């Protein structure tokens, strides 16, 4: 990471889905993450143009991609698609990609939106971005755990 240490890095996180990709932004120094936007996953061209626009706007130092798994930790259908997406991000944009186990991120995201009384269409629209926020927060929490050991 040129110019920025891992401790003060700006990060973008992605919750990859066949129809929608949730995006969150966070900062390793403040250990905070927030839901940013949901990209409609229409096709490869649309997907990477939208991601490229976000990278130009936010200029992250690294990317985090949620890796979907079954509750027992075994891969499922979306695992390989999410891996391919992360590898394509790395190849196209030259930014380091870290994988985060995203088991239960959607459940946590749903609960978080419910707690904040986000309802109906707004909840549906924000769910994937909120899941990306949960994924990124897990990553940031792991960073601080490592620093205290």
From Swiss-Prot:
GO terms for cellular component: cytosol. SMART domains: YqgFc (SM00732). One of its GO terms (biological process) is rRNA 5'-end processing. Its EC number is 3.1.-.-. The keyword Cytoplasm applies. Keywords: Cytoplasm, Hydrolase, Nuclease, Ribosome biogenesis. Its main location: cytoplasm. The keyword Cytoplasm applies. It is an enzyme of class 3 (hydrolase). InterPro entries: RNaseH-like_sf, YqgF, YqgF/RNaseH-like_dom, YqgF/RNaseH-like_dom_sf. It is found in: Cytoplasm. SUPFAM superfamilies: Ribonuclease H-like. GO terms for molecular function: nuclease activity. Belongs to the YqgF nuclease family. Could be a nuclease involved in processing of the 5'-end of pre-16S rRNA. This is Putative pre-16S rRNA nuclease. It comes from Burkholderia cenocepacia (strain HI2424). The lineage of its organism: Bacteria, Pseudomonadati, Pseudomonadota, Betaproteobacteria, Burkholderiales.
């Amino acid at each position: 990471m040129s110019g920025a240490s891992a401790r003060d890095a700006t990060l973008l996180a992605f919750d990859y889905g066949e129809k929608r990709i949730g995006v969150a932004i966070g900062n390793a120094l403040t250990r905070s993450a927030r839901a940013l936007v949901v990209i409609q996953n229409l096709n490869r061209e649309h997907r990477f143009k939208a991601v490229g626009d976000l990278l130009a706007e936010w200029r992250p130092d690294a990317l985090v991609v949620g890796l979907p798994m079954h509750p027992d930790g075994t891969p499922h259908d979306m695992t390989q698609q999410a891996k391919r997406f992360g590898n394509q991000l790395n190849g196209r944009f030259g930014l380091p990609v870290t994988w985060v186990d995203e088991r239960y991120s959607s459940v946590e995201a749903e609960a978080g939106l419910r707690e904040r009384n986000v309802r109906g269409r707004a909840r549906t629209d924000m769910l994937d971005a909120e899941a990306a926020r949960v994924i990124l927060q897990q990553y940031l929490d792991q960073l601080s755990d490592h620093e205290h050991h």
